[in-house]
Amino acid sequence: ERFLPDIYHEDEDFTPRLFARSGSLISTNLMVYAYYQRQESIVNSGNADRIKKRFSDMLVVIDRLEEQERAAEEELSRYAFHRRKEQFALSVVYQAMRLLPGKEAVADVLRQLADRHCWPLPKARYSWRYSLFRHLTDREWKINVLRQLLKRK
């Protein structure tokens, strides 16, 4: 398996595939991955072109997770890809609320998620946080209210 080249959030595409094909996993307290936020990193950039690419690439990742879900032979793998897709969709909604400049841009991302059956967020009981966020973001007007509250931070 390889990282998908030239996209942001390539780890969101790669990691689920890695887990699905691993055969076995070991739980350990060893730190094998460290994430460092840099001021100049892509995810911290306010550049409009980078933000546009970021959301385009997030949708690519959702599409690829859907493809992996359909192609998976084992039921557990199908469920894992499905769950990862739905939880990544939550991340896309949250990032849209935080980063996109206006209601129209947010509405466009929501429409694209809806076309993929990822918004409103599917009813699933992954965690109480997922359920709460799903209820708070199941309508565009609710998202617009939350966006205003986030801007006040």
Model-predicted segments: where are they?
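Amphipathic alpha-helical repeat scaffolds of TPR domains
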Residues: 82-94
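Conserved aromatic-histidine-acidic binding/catalytic patches
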Residues: 6-10, 53, 77
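Catalytic core of nucleotide-sugar-dependent glycosyltransferases
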Residues: 31-39, 45-73, 95, 100-119
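Gram-positive cell-envelope targeting signals
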Residues: 19-22, 28, 42-44, 55-62, ...
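Short, charged, amphipathic alpha-helical segments
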Residues: 77-83, 107
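Membrane-interface aromatic/basic loop that binds lipid-linked glycans or pyrophosphate carriers
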Residues: 97-153
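Conserved nucleotide-sugar donor-binding catalytic segment
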Residues: 1-48
